[in-house]
Curated annotation (Swiss-Prot):
Belongs to the Fmt family. The keyword Protein biosynthesis applies. Attaches a formyl group to the free amino group of methionyl-tRNA(fMet). The formyl group appears to play a dual role in the initiator identity of N-formylmethionyl-tRNA by promoting its recognition by IF2 and preventing the misappropriation of this tRNA by the elongation apparatus. (6S)-5,6,7,8-tetrahydrofolate binds at residues 112-115. It comes from the Bacteria. It comes from Mannheimia succiniciproducens (strain KCTC 0769BP / MBEL55E). Keywords: Protein biosynthesis, Transferase. One of its GO terms (cellular component) is cytosol. InterPro entries: Fmt (IPR005794), Formyl_trans_C (IPR005793), Formyl_trans_C_sf (IPR037022), Formyl_transf_N (IPR002376), Formyl_transf_N_sf (IPR036477), Formyl_transferase-like_C_sf (IPR011034), GART_AS (IPR001555), Met-tRNA-FMT_C (IPR044135). This is Methionyl-tRNA formyltransferase.
Amino acid sequence: MKPLKIIFAGTPDFAAQHLQALLNSHHQVIAVYTQPDKPAGRGKKLQASPVKQLAEQYNIPVYQPKSLRKEEAQAQFAQLQADVMVVVAYGLILPKAVLEMPRLGCLNVHGSILPRWRGAAPIQRAIWAGDKQTGVTIMQMDEGLDTGDMLHKVYCDITAEETSASLYHKLATLAPPALIDVLDELESGKFIAEKQEDSKSNYAEKLSKEEAKLDWSLSAAQLERNIRAFNPAPVAFLTVPVNEAEERIKVYRAEVLPHQNSAAGTVLAFDKKGLRIATAEGVLNIQQLQPSGKKPMSVQDFLNGRADWFVLGQVLN
């Protein structure tokens, strides 16, 4: 089969793993598009994206336009004369003119089984919603947000202990081989394009820091999923009044216990087994915490020197 000339567009590590798979294949990556370098770290030095760093190792031309809407950027893109563009977590909107330039269109790798979760945070929203299964969809891009025709789906289970970090790793392992399969057969017609059912779609909005605050009016099961969905970022948290200030404590692990008849947010117990807090339904037993400026730790370690932070019967906000 004839190698395809590919433009790759992506930014984070998840995208870099797909670029590596393309570089290991018989296809030819002729150019890479990625977000402009951004200030990072304490010194706020400009840092290249993982995709740019990888492309430079292979001496592949890198383009970093702030937008692809301008004529100059589009003319530059057209001159590359790619067979196909592959987009993985790029972060820029592609206008119709760009989508139509490659001979075989633009493919996108999306971290859910479409149309279930469209949008920026499908991995996190799937865990928070309690989905038992997810996967990746490789689709032909159109002007909509994750609305294009689907070419290939690969499924995986979401376990009861799954965090966004572990699921992200699973999908980053599953998706690149599936992408290569689609590219290998793109001209043969093996993968039949399937339309999405809009009525079955949900919008996976980016996680906000406001949502990360544990809301005791939800059930313990919902809060436990929240904790896993928000790990590794932005990390779920609770607040507790300490010396007339409000301490924010990050929460990394918890379990659901049967209900006790107490108001939501009531501190029921705290010992080496955990910090038990009443919710709208069931009890959340928090097992791993992180006070400000410290590393994540067990509740037993947390209570050493901080046992007075909680009072039995107090109701947390």
